[in-house]
Regions:
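Hydrophobic alpha-helical membrane-insertion segments, chiefly the h-region
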Residues: 31-42
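Short, solvent-exposed loop/turn segments that connect beta-strands within catalytic domains
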Residues: 108-111, 145-152, 201-207
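Conserved, short, structured surface segments that act as functional micro-motifs
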Residues: 138-141, 169-235
Length: 236
């Protein structure tokens, strides 16, 4: 402790503090900037690296679309060609549902492993695990004529067990493309089946209030079968 008479010493101490504090502050600032600069330098490549585009949001290439065969007719994806031997457990728009839940007439898991067929000639857009709630998914793009106009529609097969096709592969109506599954054990075996009016291989929500872009699957196939109702065989 300084004595009362040591005024000169106190003055000298205060002057030294005034000199030391700015220097300490400067050194601390430089140190912090160096740390943050090093962190930013490590982060910089991540900030400027382009994010990978999910295949679910890529558009089908023009050559892919142009080379599609024109489908002459559409059939149902399981059971017989006209949908016999199946039942629809949850129809399009019921409970905001964007597709049909198709089941074998035996119920529960009696249809596990049964064939899933391409509904028409087309090309595979996507064939992979669709993530939580979906299990394996196959999407096929089709071209068809309506009133002389070439149009495009997408068939969507979800919760499947085994996938038997690959992206870009051409398929014909009635080709087996998958087997009925349970979405990796999440549900009883059935096929979640959608028909869509867009070409993007989008996995989708499954349930939605706004159904624009989605079509009633059973109604569409019934309107575009091009075959009598008693044609139940899978003969092309």
């Amino acid at each position: 402790m300084l004595a009362r008479g040591d005024g000169a010493s106190l003055k000298l101490l205060m002057e030294n503090k005034r000199k030391i504090w700015p220097r300490a502050l400067l050194l601390s600032t430089v140190f912090l900037l160096a740390l943050s600069g090093g962190f930013f330098f490590r982060l910089w490549p991540e900030l400027h690296r382009p994010a990978p585009i999910d295949p679910a949001f890529r558009f089908a290439p023009a050559i892919f679309v142009a080379s599609l065969p024109t489908a002459a007719r559409f059939d149902f994806p399981m059971g017989s060609e006209n949908g016999a031997l199946t039942y629809n457990a949850q129809r399009f728009t019921a409970n905001r549902h964007l597709g049909d839940d198709l089941n074998g007439i035996g119920g529960e898991n009696s249809d596990l492993g049964d064939p899933v067929y391409a509904v028409a000639d087309g090309r595979v857009l996507l064939a992979r695990d669709g993530g939580s709630g979906w299990g394996n998914v196959v999407i096929v793009l089709h071209a068809y004529l309506e009133n002389g106009e070439r149009k495009y529609v997408q068939s969507y097969y979800a919760h499947v067990d085994t996938i038997l096709v690959a992206p870009k592969q051409m398929v014909r109506r009635g080709d087996q493309i998958a087997t009925i599954g349970t979405a990796h054990g999440k549900y009883l075996a059935h096929l979640h089946f959608e028909m869509r009016e867009f070409a993007t291989p989008f996995i989708g929500p499954g349930y939605r209030d706004d159904t624009r872009g989605w079509i009633d699957p059973s109604a569409f196939i019934a309107a575009h079968r091009g075959a009598p109702d008693d044609d139940v065989g899978r003969v092309r």
